[in-house]
């Protein structure tokens, strides 16, 4: 049986979460996982946890995302990988794909350009994702990369769900609309719920954390979601206000 090894990265502005999976068809096994934290800041560190083992933490300078990914690869090579050639691919979580992507795609220069161009809509996430993609491209030029977008799952919403009550020109010119976020999470949760319930039907998946969102899913397809033009809109969250009357900041 041929097991593929896939490295999945979630790049933040000063952190990088990673998991290495053994993939056999539709079966996934976490081989190792960890975090590179405080990238570009004093006191940076990298952690690794292999299988059910203890988490091991190493403090070392991590000036850039490229250096962080290099250290992660070195840790994996020293524990669960015999060679970098064992890696079949690298996957990245990207927050904002705008209207360009309704599914995961292979990375090429045009994809990188689009992700970078959408940075104003996800300033904490998209620039970091681009740094991670470029770092992998430099370190592992022959390994294919795939990006999965938080917005992709919500691209099935109809205009009555995603359009704001603004002049149509604002949408046509600036693409101002509801995009949603946490789509990968909503897709997974709605699928798992459907399995447990025994039918797809109507499901309300909730993603609750420092960022939080709720979606409406009918027969496996997203029909509405709480987040909007950016991940700031919607319900009250751990570190974001959610919806606030637009006059409040002007009043203050």
Please provide the spans of the model-predicted regions.
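Conserved Class I SAM-dependent methyltransferase catalytic core
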Residues: 133-136, 140-156
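Short beta-strand-loop/turn "lid" adjacent to the catalytic site in phosphate-handling enzymes
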Residues: 76-125, 146, 153-161
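N-terminal glycine/serine-rich phosphate-binding loop of ATP-dependent small-molecule kinases
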Residues: 2-98
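Generic structural signal for well-ordered alpha-helical scaffold segments
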Residues: 73, 77, 133, 137, ...
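Glycine-rich phosphate-binding loop of actin/hexokinase-like ATP-binding domains
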Residues: 153-252
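Short beta-strand segments
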Residues: 91-93, 146-149, 204-211
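Non-transmembrane, aqueous-exposed alpha-helical and coiled segments at domain scale
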Residues: 84, 127, 131, 140-142, ...
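A gly/proline- and charged-residue-enriched helix-loop-helix capping module
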Residues: 114-132, 136, 174-176, 183-187
């Amino acid at each position: 049986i041929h097991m593929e090894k896939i490295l999945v990265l979630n790049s933040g502005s000063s952190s990088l979460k990673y998991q290495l999976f053994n993939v056999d068809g539709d079966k996934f096994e976490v081989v190792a996982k960890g975090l590179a934290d405080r990238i570009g800041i004093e006191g940076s560190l990298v952690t690794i946890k292999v299988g059910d083992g203890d988490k091991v933490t190493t403090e070392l300078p991590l000036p850039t995302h490229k250096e962080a990914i290099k250290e992660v690869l070195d840790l994996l090579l020293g524990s669960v990988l015999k060679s970098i050639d064992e890696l079949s691919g690298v996957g990245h979580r990207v927050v904002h794909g705008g209207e360009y992507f309704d599914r995961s795609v292979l990375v090429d220069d045009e994809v990188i350009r689009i992700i970078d161009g959408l940075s104003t809509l996800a300033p904490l996430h998209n620039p970091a994702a681009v740094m991670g993609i470029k770092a992998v491209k430099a370190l592992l030029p022959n390994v294919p990369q795939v990006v999965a977008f938080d917005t992709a799952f919500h691209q099935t919403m109809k205009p009555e769900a995603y359009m704001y009550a603004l002049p149509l020109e604002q949408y046509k010119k600036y693409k101002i609309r509801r995009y949603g976020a946490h789509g990968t999470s909503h897709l997974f949760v709605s699928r798992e719920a459907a399995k447990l319930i025994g039918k797809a039907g109507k499901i309300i998946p909730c993603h609750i954390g420092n960022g939080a969102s709720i979606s409406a899913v009918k027969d496996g397809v997203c029909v509405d979601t709480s987040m909007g033009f950016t991940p700031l809109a919607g319900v009250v969250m751990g570190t974001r206000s959610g919806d606030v009357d637009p006059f409040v900041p002007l009043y203050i």
